Amino acid sequence: MDMNEYYNGVIEEALEGFKRVNNTDQVEQKIYEVPAATWEINVVRGKVLEKATISRVTLDTKHPVTGDDTHFDALQSKVYPLNPKIPVLIFIIEHMVSGGKTFFSGMMDVIPAVPIEDDLRFLGAEMKKVAEKHGEDYEALRQKGSTIFKLEQWE
């Protein structure tokens, strides 16, 4: 399945929205190419969205386990509002074709730029309920996640 038309449409729509919110026509674009991959980065800066990005990475390679020809596409958008009380938005979709199989995944995250203790306690309690519903140990999962995603400068 060729996803180019879809990805190009998403990029165009996102950039139009970023420009409209920031009241600008300017888009910074960089494209990096190597034999197996292309990375396109688009950035809109302004007084509402300090930085809003949408980037696409394409990679054509061999699957490391099967040796099958593999095409990988990732589309990422990250939005950093100027107002620190508005959360950062991250959106990622990925599409891979390998060995005659197609895989599609995605995720979205909203990250508060200024942690509010009441909100963090509420979110933790709700996440604990979800973990318990599925028979998981919330504290063990939280500890595992904190070691995977911990940066020294956060200390």
Where are these regions (language model features)?
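Gly/Pro-rich turn-and-neighbor structural signature
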Residues: 1-67
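Residue-level detector of solvent-exposed, low-hydrophobicity positions
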Residues: 13-14, 46, 87, 111, ...
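Long, contiguous internal "core" modules enriched in hydrophobic/ aromatic residues
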Residues: 98-155
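Generic structural motif recognizing short loop/turn segments at the entrances and edges of beta-strands
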Residues: 25-30, 35-40, 50-53, 71-73, ...
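Context-gated lysine
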Residues: 19, 30, 47, 51, ...
